């Protein structure tokens, strides 16, 4: 996004729809729209007086014929296109939170895809960074060697502290101070940045090398700060550790 773009923000919502196999729904933009043929997570503009959830429900009914019963706020990004400057709020919709058969009501194509193994292209520019974010597991456990371990649609997922990382490790965890001093580790496919308070969170969130944030919560005030950050909207996944 250009920092000099002063155009008004267009408020847009998009849905990350999952099926029972853990796959994500992508659809192509129909003919006649900007970026026709590009793949995206479906959604659309929030109308005046409309809530984000209501807009999400309306757009999916209009475009794909499915009904959304519940949705969880996820990431929030601002992106400048040639035709508009948009604020995109992404919602995750689990397999039991929607119903109906998918219909291409605008003549678009659609496809179920696995996180980390997307086979359709090209992707809409604002949606591209989400592909890496979707590979982050929703639950992680601390292993005996200090790594964070979980699973995604592609199998085992492991995050290793930078100080003990081997050259083949893809996901690296480092403190925000180390990120600011040394930058992105050259071997890292995904950089996790550890923060402990709101100031560190803001510094890490603003750094272009940050792929995932890990916020260690020590008390109630930390928990409140996390809730405020989530309400404001995070551009990258935020993991919380007690």
Predicted regions and their residues:
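Short, P/G- and charge-enriched loop/turn segments at secondary-structure junctions
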Residues: 1-5, 77, 98-99, 118
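Catalytic beta/alpha-barrel core
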Residues: 142-145, 153-221, 236-242
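The catalytic Nudix box helix
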Residues: 41-73, 114
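Conserved N-terminal beta-strand and adjoining loop/helix that marks the start
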Residues: 2-24, 45, 76
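Conserved hydrophobic/aromatic beta-strand scaffold that supports enzyme active sites
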Residues: 16, 26, 88-92, 112
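Active-site-adjacent beta-strand/loop module that shapes the phosphate/pyrophosphate-binding cleft
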Residues: 77-101
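Nudix hydrolase/Nudix homology domain
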Residues: 100-159, 224, 232-235, 239
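A conserved beta-turn-beta hairpin within the catalytic core of GNAT-like acetyltransferases
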Residues: 34-38
């Amino acid at each position: 996004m250009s920092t000099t773009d002063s155009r008004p923000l267009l408020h847009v919502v998009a849905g990350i729809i999952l099926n029972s196999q853990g796959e994500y729904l992508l659809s192509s933009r129909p003919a006649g729209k900007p970026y026709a043929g590009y793949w995206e997570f479906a959604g659309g503009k929030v109308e005046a007086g409309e809530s984000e959830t209501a807009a999400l429900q309306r757009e999916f009914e209009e475009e794909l014929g499915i009904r959304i019963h519940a949705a969880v706020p996820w990431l929030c990004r601002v992106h400048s296109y040639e035709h508009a400057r948009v604020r995109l709020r992404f919602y995750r919709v689990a397999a039991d939170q929607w119903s109906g058969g998918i219909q291409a009501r605008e003549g678009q194509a659609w496809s179920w895809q696995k996180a980390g193994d997307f086979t359709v292209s090209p992707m809409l520019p604002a949606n591209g960074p989400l592909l890496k974010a979707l590979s982050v597991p929703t639950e992680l456990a601390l292993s005996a060697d200090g790594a964070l371990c979980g699973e995604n649609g592609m199998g085992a997922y492991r995050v290793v502290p930078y100080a003990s990382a081997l050259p083949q490790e893809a996901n690296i965890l480092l403190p925000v101070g180390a990120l600011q001093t040394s930058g992105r580790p050259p071997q890292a496919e995904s950089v996790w940045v550890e923060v402990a308070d709101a100031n560190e969170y803001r510094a890490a969130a603003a750094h272009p090398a940050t792929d995932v944030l890990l916020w260690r919560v020590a008390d109630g005030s930390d928990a409140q700060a996390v809730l405020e950050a989530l309400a404001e909207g995070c551009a990258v996944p935020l993991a919380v550790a007690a």
